[in-house]
Amino acid sequence: MSEPLQLIGRIFVSREQLAHFNAHVIDSSQRYDDWGDWLGGKQWYGDSSEAEVVAGADCGQRFEDWFGMFFKEHELWPGAGEFMKIFGVAFNDYDDEEGCWKFMVFEFSENYLDFMSAVNALRQIDSMPGPPIHGQLAIVPYMFGPGFNACEVVVTIADGKSTLSKQVTPEFEAWATHCFETLEFPSD
C-alpha cells in the first residue's frame, strides 16, 4: 500500500481575487494543453489512458465547495476533518500581512485522478482578474518519501498563467519545510 502525498501551496493574491476564485465554477481540464508534460510516462492503476485521466478531473462545481471537502469530514473516519484542523495537518488561511493564501492537506491522496482534479482546480487561479498573481503549489511525498527532491507535480503561477514542473523554488521549499516541521501530532 502506498502512502498519501501532501498538497501544499502559497499563492500571492489579493483577498478580493481569492474571494472571486472561491466563488468561481471549476472549468474543464481541457482549458490547459500541457498535461502530457506531467502525465507522460506515468503509471496508474487500471487501464485508463492519459486522455481519460485528464478528462476525469472534477469540474462544474464551485471551487470553495470542492476545496472545502478537505477541511470537513474525511472518509477515513468520523471526525478526521476536525482532527486535521486541531493538530495543524490541514490549513486554508489568508495572511493579510503578506497578501498570501496558504494551504496544506497533509493526507491528500495517492491517486492520479485526485492529483489531476486538484491541479486543474487550483491552477485556475491564474485567470482571476486584478493585480498579477504569483506563487506555487506542490503535491509532494514529504513525510513518506524523498520530499522536495521528488515532487509529483509543481504548479508555478506567474504572469497570468500557470505552468507544470517538478521543482519548487528555494523560497517555497524553505517555507513549506517549515510548515511540515512545525506540525503537531497527538501523542498516545
Region spans (language model):
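Charged interaction segments
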Residues: A51-D188
